[in-house]
Amino acid sequence: MGVPKKRTSSMRRDRRRAANFKLKPVNVVKCPKCKEPVLPHRACPSCGTYKGEQITEAS
């Protein structure tokens, strides 16, 4: 078995781990009523609807 000759520094270890950490882009859909961009599974901030029902007042 191979054994490391030198200890891996914390900076090198963290840099290697950070290379694989990537944020996923935000999934944005259009509101079926007002066609504004909305995050999925949330009420529309512009018209206040969620799943076709009026939840909050329009802002």
Curated annotation (Swiss-Prot):
GO function terms (MF aspect): structural constituent of ribosome
Keywords on record: Ribonucleoprotein, Ribosomal protein
SUPFAM superfamilies given in the database record: Zn-binding ribosomal proteins
Transmembrane segments: none
Superkingdom of the source species: Bacteria
GO BP terms in the entry: translation
Recorded GO CC terms: large ribosomal subunit
Family per similarity comment: Belongs to the bacterial ribosomal protein bL32 family.
PANTHER family: 50S RIBOSOMAL PROTEIN L32, LARGE RIBOSOMAL SUBUNIT PROTEIN BL32
Protein name per UniProt: Large ribosomal subunit protein bL32
Naturally occurring in which organism (per UniProt): Anaeromyxobacter dehalogenans (strain 2CP-C)
